[in-house]
Regions:
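Short glycine-rich phosphate-binding loop at a beta-alpha junction
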Residues: 71-77
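Long, low-complexity, Lys/Arg-enriched
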Residues: 1-70, 84-87, 91-125
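Conserved histidine-centered catalytic loops in small-molecule metabolism enzymes
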Residues: 80
Length: 125
């Protein structure tokens, strides 16, 4: 795990998974990177959007995130937008992370249940 100076600042959760739904282990891991967690909803991306639309949205969302002065950002969502935002945040010197989880599958008859258990955050490199 990255060493963060006293966890001061804000950890931005830029996903469509509100932190209120996280398990305690994930909350504690996020608070290692910041003294508070701020949820910023990852937008729905129109599959018919072209590259220019996507770049404009990435620029808008990156500016919004940077205005929060994050110590770290969890960025997960639609691949194209995610990639563009991650690159921009990295260029601005922001630590950008994604969640690593263990996938557990339980099959009972014709029903398959999948559970994802958070393990850690990993830095985009």
């Amino acid at each position: 795990m990255d060493k963060v100076e006293d966890g001061i600042g804000v950890f931005v959760n830029f996903t469509n998974h509100p932190s209120q739904m996280w398990e305690n282990v994930q909350i504690r891991a996020a608070l290692h990177y910041g003294e508070s967690i701020l949820d910023l909803l990852f937008p729905q991306v129109d599959p018919m959007a072209d590259e220019i639309d996507l770049q404009n949205l990435a620029e808008e969302k990156t500016s919004e995130i940077l205005s929060l002065h994050p110590t770290a950002v969890l960025c997960q969502g639609e691949f194209g937008l995610c990639f563009s935002v991650v690159r921009r945040l990295q260029k601005a010197g922001v630590r950008v992370l994604y969640a690593c989880s263990e996938r557990k599958v339980r099959v009972e008859g014709s029903t398959k249940t999948v559970q994802f258990d958070f393990v850690k955050f990993r830095r985009y490199e």
